[in-house]
Amino acid sequence: MKLLLLLVVLGTVSARVQDLSGKMFTFPKQTNTAHVKLNPTKLDYNAVTVCHRSVTDIKRDHAIFSLATPSQNNGFLTFWQNGNQEIQPHIRNARVEYGGWDYKLNTWHSICTTWDSEKGLVQIWVDGMPSIRRYISSGAISGAVKIVLGQEQDTFGGGFDINQSFVGMITDVHMWDYTLSSCEIQNYMGEMNLTPGNVLNWRALDFETIGSVLIEDKPVCHPASICVG
């Protein structure tokens, strides 16, 4: 894979909106500082869908997507728990454990998480396969939010633990303030037609990079068929 190095960050880069189509964030080493801060377009959420693709070779716990509020450090978190081999969504400081996934190292994985506050149900999709829907937490995610890639927030916007940091690559991050249909999620999984996130849009992403983070060309993927209907 031919990678075009666009940016090596040694400090904080000012926020900007950029089309990252065909690009990825690379987190090349284990730190408790390097991360990407994403700036969402709204504050209060009665429903959420978050999708992202990532690849890593680390054999330990790590966070992929971390949203915190002043009162809830795990407002919306996607976390891999290595000891039990579980993907753990955390919402409003509650947690559900999903085991049985073939979460291979050195392999790209597409993950989507959906949740709505009315029913309090969460569901994850991993590489096109859905989990069961389980109760996690009802009630809205309210107030100011901070969203981070590459670290897990133990405090609002900080409290990073090097042993929970992400090492690898992340791409195609989208966030919606509603639950995507199963067909829309399958289209995301296959990298086909997709309505981009209305909260976070990879094609017009407002972000800041902090520490040792690279922006590189992502590998060419082989598209699957479009889900219609």
Identify the residue ranges that each predicted region occupies:
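Extracellular glycan-associated modules
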Residues: 1-229
